[in-house]
Amino acid sequence: GGIWYPFSPRPEEVRFADQFAAARLPRYGCHTKRGVDRYVVMHHEVLVCRLLRAWGEPLITQACGLFHDQGEIYTPGDQIGPMLRGSHPFSIAAKALADEQQRCVNQRFGLPWPYPEHIAKPVKLADAVLLSTERRDLMADSDVDWGHMLEPLPERIEPWEPERAWEAWLNELELVGMWHIVECA
């Protein structure tokens, strides 16, 4: 492993080999329903990328979807939504840290940050569709109001093992035209 300074991250310290961490990084802080094995960030990113492709989005938008949570492999990790959306000083600091990690990842791999509106809008929409699908398939039933939820995908999500998530992510990397970052790693 390399070294990472979360309060002064540098794109040149982002290593391709580190990206596998997203295949082990659980979404929702591991708070999925009983019987659901860990659902990882990389699986989610693959599904976002595939949804963007199904909608006919350009390769750059698909690539941004594939990388949209890769900054989470660094501190502070995958934070639950209420933690990042709050007005508490910790929430504000965690969101700033998360944005800075994502900026470094995107800059290192030649992707824009922040995403321009024509990329941000479809990536956020795909992310929201996946959130609805993940809630239906992976979360325990609850009376908690999550606000306006979009229609989930018809397909059900079955969590993948880390190696399967990694292989699928690498396949998507090639499909979006970014295989060169593997060859340069």
Question: What feature does the model see in each segment?
Answer:
Residues 1-185:
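Metal-dependent phosphohydrolase cores
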